[in-house]
Amino acid sequence: MTAVETVLGSITPNLLGRTLTHEHVALDFEHFYRPPPADFESELKAKISMSTLGYVRLYPYSSKENVRFYDEEALEAAKKDVLLYKKHGGGSIVENSSYGLKRNLEFIVELAKSTGVHFIAGTGHYIHAVQDASHASLTVEQMSDLYTKDILTGIEIKGKMVKCGFIGEVASVYPIHEFEKNSIKATGEIQEVLGCGVSFHPHRDAQAPFDIMRLYLEAGGRAQKCVMSHLDRTLFKIEELVELSELGCYLQYDLFGTECSYYQLNTNVDMISDGQRIENLMKLIEEGLLDRLLMSHDIHTKHRLTSYGGHGYHHIHTNILPRMFARGVTLEQVEQMTVTNPANWLSFDP
């Protein structure tokens, strides 16, 4: 019988409820720090406060405090927001911190116990540049063994084995580094054997998602169990999204709440707004792709938590869904994207 593997054990898919499919509650994002503009250097070096928050929102990766999403203040703020998410109807969170991002599995388990929200943890590797020597030298076979162990046996946390419930986020740059090609291949091989869900983080080049899918499918991975993340900053034309969907993967809009058009990690494009995200999802529904759509926030910096003036994990539930209903999206369609699709993606029978 198929089930979903949470950090507290297996559950039936119908218990997930509304699910955020791409979030982080603790990770190290300091690799992506960018030096601040000279005009705002002092403001972005200062502690995040009401007087500096405007600068941090414009240049989120130029505040070292902001990208340290792992200290005690961040963990306390994340827990507060998970409780708010629960209060506003949230059921489950898929935590996408993989090897290289310093995933805090002990904290994830504690959150699941203390908040009542189901957490699904991921295995897999982030980009080569953030790996330590012990992981950077892994072969495809060694990666496959590691992912299998994390899913079937688990990782020991305080004397108990905690199992991962999917492979992700599996990240790559562009052109794809050889290490990252190996991690994609290992992901495809293990997905074919175990039947688990997987989630990919593509680079910001429009060709990246297609190259990832080619490597994954060639390795034996099943397209229907694969999520392509961050499409709201990667593919901007509906035609491109439809073309990607023809490969069979889920299309994930996971930057809801990011409303700053200036995108520090790719200054050649403008980040779309929540309004545009809603519009694009509605167009994709019209294209007959309702059963391939997922929504999330990808919170990975402090300024997006409510304690730091942000929107929190409940933003989609409290702000986005009412806007979608007002524009004609039905409850049945919302349930498909936020309940049914996540459950179908995450459920497997190893």
UniProtKB/Swiss-Prot annotation:
Its cofactor is a divalent metal cation. Binds 2 divalent metal cations per subunit. Belongs to the metallo-dependent hydrolases superfamily. Phosphotriesterase family. InterPro entries: AryldialkylPase_Zn-BS, Metal_Hydrolase, Phosphotriesterase. PANTHER family: PHOSPHOTRIESTERASE-RELATED, PHOSPHOTRIESTERASE-RELATED PROTEIN. Its EC number is 3.1.-.-. It is an enzyme of class 3 (hydrolase). It comes from Drosophila pseudoobscura pseudoobscura. A divalent metal cation 1 binds at residues 22, 24, 169, 298. Gene3D superfamilies: Metal-dependent hydrolases. A divalent metal cation 2 binds at residues 169, 201, 230. GO terms for molecular function: hydrolase activity, acting on ester bonds; zinc ion binding. This is Phosphotriesterase-related protein. One of its GO terms (biological process) is catabolic process. Keywords: Hydrolase, Metal-binding. Pfam families: PTE.
